[in-house]
Amino acid sequence: VLADVYNVEPETLR
């Protein structure tokens, strides 16, 4: 899931 990728770099979610 895309969330898995963002989970590695939470800063990307921001």
From Swiss-Prot:
Protein's name in the database: Uncharacterized protein 1
Superkingdom of origin: Eukaryota
